[in-house]
Amino acid sequence: MKMENFEYELKMAIEHILETNYPRKAFWHFDDLIDDLKSGIKAGDDAVVIKNMVINMEGPYPLKLGAKTALIHTACDVVAMGAEPKFALNAIQAKNEDEIKLAVDGLRKQSIGLNIPIIGGNTQTVEELKSCISVAVFGELIDENLIIKDGGAKDGDLLIMLGDPVEGDVGERIYKAKKKFDTYLEILENGIKINACKDASRGGWLGNLLEMLIKAKKGAEIKSLPYPRATRYLGTYIIAVPEEEYEKVVDIALKNKCPVVLFGRILEKPKLIIGTKEYISENKMLELIKKFPYKY
């Protein structure tokens, strides 16, 4: 990857994580109205946690893409926070009955493959509107005292990438996602300590790693490139794990035939180093931290 291309991707990654600043500030105090809220708009995490329930909503996706991945992607964030998905709702806007069938058949395949029943939602046909799909997934923490947040990385943690890129036809996507979900939940069920986890979705591994670092007020040293295009959608998990727990993670990943790649380490000082080059200085990272209204 040429340096100028990577620096362009870095700029795009920063712009991506800035997109949610206004809505987060606008809805900031709504958290205070909800009893038993453990993680909401102030945390800005992948999903909302109320008591032991974890909820995430995604979309709208273009209809054909959503038919292949909407439920998969929405469930991904629920699992990342340490929850098992239990059921889902969907909303479909289609232009005609053929599009409704395309959307429903694709969502049904995802639902059966992941064992996440779709139990309700809304379907409409308005020709003037673009065809799209949105999904909400409701999950339950596997341990009500354990929430894996995306901003919990600690100095010295190893950075790993877990899972295959979620791409291909709907069957391939289901297979890859389920293997990743099962492996990750098994890691947690075995008491292996995970300090932070985030789905490398829109924004790629770079954008999502930057958000993790900003929230944790930490830096990272990247020693290998899990995927050369840094802002590509992957659907893998970026995980910060204590070094002494890493081999246990590898053991479970090997048993489940789930890819795991070690690609860096968390630093106490907030900066981003890739190879020998410092791409984000400590001063620049501190400026980014000040711009984001996250509260853990």
From Swiss-Prot:
Q: Which SUPFAM superfamilies match?
A: PurM C-terminal domain-like, PurM N-terminal domain-like
**What molecular functions are annotated in GO for this chain?**
thiamine-phosphate kinase activity
A Pfam family: AIRS
Q: Which residues cross the membrane?
A: none
A biological process (GO) of this protein is:
thiamine biosynthetic process
What domain of life does the native source organism fall in? Archaea
What the record says about family reads: To Synechocystis PCC 6803 sll0787 and M.jannaschii MJ0640.
State what protein this is by name. Uncharacterized protein MJ0799
**Origin species:** Methanocaldococcus jannaschii (strain ATCC 43067 / DSM 2661 / JAL-1 / JCM 10045 / NBRC 100440)
The lineage, from the top, is: Archaea, Methanobacteriati, Methanobacteriota, Methanomada group, Methanococci
